[in-house]
């Protein structure tokens, strides 16, 4: 078959790809990725539609090829060639070149998966660096959408016929809203979009292109409605609880967050009652279930942080901070906010248990959007934080450690190469949870953050350093969400024969792991010295 339209597509015209490779990649994308974000019109997945796809929607086609080609680990040059072209197209959009709704769709797809070919440097240990790229791609998508007046489709149309005319634009704009909210929640930034969102009375009938055409087709319209409702809850929680450092800190110290958190918990439970039994494919439903559990964690974790803030504000000057915090959290059941603290821990464990037991790593997790990998890491880091403050019992610690190990195994199985997100973040979890401290590792005594006033906020907004280079804890920080800080912490072990900190073995018997400074090299000294560790090797954050 001759593809006259496809022949004009730059990558085919210049010999980087053949029509057969393009068709194969488009089909692989449809089979593996499309179900998680069905932005590409279904008509483009037929082989006869490749010509029109290449002529009309070159941005969208290139985004599809960029994402799918990342799986061709034996032919990395294909992904590199497509990524270079994708980079040129994105630069063109940023420079104001003519484009249509398909460019917005392409940017949204890139933000969901962030193919490695678009980044200059990929570290072996994941540090959340994909979030920066996603943040920029979503921002460009929103600004382009505003320029194309996609926001006008946020309101219900007069008739079903009008709804069909603007269906593609409306779905693209609705996904701009979803992506904006979810990436902002991940990185703790304000929303890009403050205009009308898609929550102005829209329902499944407003997305006719997502509705099933034949028996057995996936009802993407219903799935997307559930996602919209959940995103609105994420948005509300972020706006009210995490809206700003000053207001959040005041709310923590005054304790007037209880009503908000209780109301949010009720709303989240109602979402579960409405959508918990949605009829769809299991690998799609599990993404909704995992998002629900992460929302529970995100909501309840605010109270956990508030209790830490209140405890620090009441600490006596002559009492060590670590001892004071462990004493406060030694009996969570007696605390007025116990239900929230237990709820956050339970949600984190539920999320990780779902990943370990209900997600096929090679058939499904491998192709899921990046946020589910990051939700996994956030949940694991949160549990590490809970352990640091003595919230977990000895039995819970052992169970959580086993669960983390299972998640590491699942993440690795999902990876096709060391550059895959699963492999990189599995390494981060391994460094954080599983590495025992060897004899000869130096010990840097903990400094009380309350004792110093010359600390500064780092560029990440979550780590404070004093004049001596030690990390300082601030009750207003939410650094269980700061993977760059976690990456900095574990980077004290860049080589296989070095250990960044004490793991579970040292936690159980810290007396066996007293350090000797003279055996530690300069690089490890430089890295570890920036962080506070207690005798159990716990990071204070």
Q: Can you say where each PLM-predicted feature lies in the sequence?
A:
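Low-complexity, Ser/Thr/Pro/Gly-enriched N-terminal "stalk/linker" regions
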Residues: 24-25, 29-32
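The first (N-terminal) embedded transmembrane alpha-helix
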Residues: 33-36, 109
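Intrinsically disordered, low-complexity regulatory regions with latent secondary structure
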Residues: 2, 6-8, 12, 405-457, ...
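Extended, leucine-rich alpha-helical cores of fungal transcription factors
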Residues: 11-23, 44-62, 76-202, 213-270, ...
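A short secondary-structure junction motif
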Residues: 65-77, 112-115, 487-489, 493, ...
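Short, basic/glycine-rich phosphate-binding loops at helix/coil junctions
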Residues: 5, 60-67
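Long, low-complexity intrinsically disordered regions enriched in Pro/Ser/Thr and acidic residues
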Residues: 205-207
């Amino acid at each position: 078959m001759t593809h006259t339209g496809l022949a004009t597509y730059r990558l085919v015209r210049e010999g980087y790809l053949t029509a057969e490779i393009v068709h194969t990649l488009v089909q692989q994308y449809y089979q593996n990725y499309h179900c998680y974000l069905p932005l590409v019109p279904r008509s483009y997945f037929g082989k006869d539609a490749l010509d029109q796809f290449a002529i009309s929607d070159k941005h969208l086609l290139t985004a599809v090829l960029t994402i799918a080609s990342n799986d061709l680990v034996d032919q990395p040059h294909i992904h590199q060639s497509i990524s270079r072209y994708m980079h040129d197209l994105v630069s063109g959009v940023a420079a104001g070149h003519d484009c249509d709704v398909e460019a917005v769709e392409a940017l949204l797809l890139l933000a969901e998966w962030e193919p490695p070919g678009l980044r200059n440097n990929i570290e072996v240990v994941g540090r959340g660096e994909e979030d920066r790229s996603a943040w920029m791609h979503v921002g460009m998508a929103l600004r382009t959408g505003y320029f194309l007046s996609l926001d006008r489709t946020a309101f219900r149309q007069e008739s079903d016929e009008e709804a069909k005319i603007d269906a593609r634009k409306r779905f693209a704009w609705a996904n701009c809203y979803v992506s904006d909210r979810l990436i902002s929640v991940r990185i703790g930034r304000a929303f890009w979009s403050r205009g009308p969102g898609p929550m102005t009375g829209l329902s499944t009938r407003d997305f006719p292109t997502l509705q099933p055409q034949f028996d057995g087709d996936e009802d993407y319209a219903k799935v997307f409605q559930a996602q919209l409702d959940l995103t609105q809850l994420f948005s509300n929680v972020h706006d009210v609880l995490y809206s700003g450092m000053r207001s959040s800190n005041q709310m923590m110290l005054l304790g007037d967050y209880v009503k908000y958190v209780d109301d949010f918990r009720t709303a989240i439970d109602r979402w579960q009652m409405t959508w918990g039994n949605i009829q769809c494919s299991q690998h799609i439903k599990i993404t909704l279930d995992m998002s629900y559990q992460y929302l529970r964690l995100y909501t309840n974790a605010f109270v956990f942080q508030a209790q830490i803030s209140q405890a620090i504000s009441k600490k006596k000057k002559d009492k060590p901070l670590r001892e004071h915090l462990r004493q406060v959290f030694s009996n969570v059941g007696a605390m007025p906010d116990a239900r929230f603290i237990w709820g956050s821990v339970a949600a984190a464990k539920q999320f990780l248990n779902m990943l370990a037991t209900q997600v096929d790593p090679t058939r499904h997790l491998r192709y899921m959007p990046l946020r589910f990998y990051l939700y996994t890491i956030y949940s694991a880091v949160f549990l590490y934080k809970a352990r640091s403050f003595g919230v977990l019992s000895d039995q819970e610690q052992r169970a959580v450690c086993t669960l983390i190990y299972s998640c590491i195994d699942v993440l690795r199985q999902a990876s096709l190469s060391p550059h895959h997100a699963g492999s990189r973040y599995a390494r981060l979890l391994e460094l954080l949870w599983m590495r025992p401290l060897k004899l000869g590792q130096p010990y840097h005594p903990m400094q009380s953050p309350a004792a110093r006033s010359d600390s500064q906020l780092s560029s990440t907004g979550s780590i404070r350093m004093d004049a001596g280079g030690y990390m300082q804890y601030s009750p207003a920080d939410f650094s269980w969400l700061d993977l760059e800080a976690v990456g900095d912490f574990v980077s004290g072990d860049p080589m296989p024969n070095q250990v960044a900190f004490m793991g579970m073995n040292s936690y159980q018997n810290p007396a066996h792991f007293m350090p000797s400074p003279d055996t530690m090299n300069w690089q490890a000294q430089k890295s570890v010295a920036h962080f506070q560790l207690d005798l159990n090797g716990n990071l204070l954050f």
